[in-house]
A protein has these predicted regions:
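Catalytic core of PPM/PP2C metal-dependent serine/threonine phosphatase domains
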Residues: 1-41, 116-122, 130
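Extracellular and analogous surface-interaction loops
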Residues: 18-21, 68-72
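Intrinsically disordered or compositionally simple regulatory linkers and C-terminal tails
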Residues: 133-140
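Active-site-proximal, acidic helix/loop segment immediately C-terminal to a metal-coordinating Asp/Glu
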Residues: 45, 52, 70, 74-122, ...
Length: 140
């Protein structure tokens, strides 16, 4: 990856995720990125990393890699650091724990509205929500 401004010490956070919709196998790759969240019922798990952003001098070559399984009926939420300040995301954990819906767009909208109310939009906000429905076989 070539980074613009590398000679001046520019850097960027990278937050990638792959998810197999059939098995739920999910892998997070994080370079200095904000936490992600896994929700199933009233339980919420925070997925974090310790690596520095990409492009910093002396940064290790590999991102933090976390492998998990997204359960059927579970949601995966990825945010940028403009949504919730690092270390101040308890409100988001509580919001996710109390969410009982299945519509990813509605959940993203709710997170954004609460972030605007709390954080006053001091940075850009990016929110992605993935919902893994129960298998059709179990629904019949």
């Amino acid at each position: 990856m070539a980074l613009r401004g590398a000679e001046t010490g520019s850097f960027t956070t990278i937050d990638l995720c792959t998810c197999d919709p059939l098995t739920g196998e999910t892998v997070f790759y994080k370079y200095g990125a904000a936490p992600s969240y896994l929700k199933k019922g009233g339980s919420v798990r925070r997925v974090t990393g310790a690596s520095l952003p990409a492009g910093l001098r002396g940064n290790p070559a590999a991102p933090d890699v976390t492998r998990i399984r997204l359960e059927e009926g579970g949601s995966l939420v990825m945010i940028s650091d403009g949504v919730a300040d690092p270390g101040r995301d308890e409100w988001l954990m509580d919001l996710l724990a109390g969410w009982e819906g299945e519509d990813p767009q509605a959940l993203a909208g709710l997170i954004l509205a609460e972030s605007v109310r709390r954080e006053k939009l001091q940075d850009d906000c990016g929110i992605q929500v993935l919902y893994r429905p129960a298998s059709r076989e179990k629904m019949v």
